[in-house]
């Protein structure tokens, strides 16, 4: 799942930005000036893709949102159930159940799959048994 995208983890954002189809997608770049490490974010609002980079612009996390990310770039449909994901990716290294945050509202269950050099976090919808978001992270930034 998402193997080509995981290859961008740890590489400069410019590598992804120069590659198809991403080089054709409009994006917004911002720097979080209020934080000491000053991370750089790239948001592709029309395509459900977000990148978070170190201050040297090396990608440490890639967020793929089910409502607008191009399904052709994933090996698993966002319509997959949690059991479908577990069948494909195996036993998760960590999991969490659905919960309600007093301010942010309902969150669905989630699973984290550790891989050599990176991790795959799959968040599920609170209102349906399907994927809400997939996050790819370098191993050194996994919470």
Language model feature labels by segment:
Residues 62-69, 136-142:
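Short, solvent-exposed aromatic-acidic interface loops
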Residues 3-4, 8-55, 80-143:
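A cross-family detector of function-defining hotspots
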Residues 58-60:
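Charged interaction scaffolds used for protein-protein
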Residues 68-71, 75-83:
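A low-complexity, Ser/Thr/Gly/Pro-enriched, surface-exposed linker/loop concept
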Residues 4, 8, 63, 72-73:
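Acidic/proline-rich low-complexity IDRs
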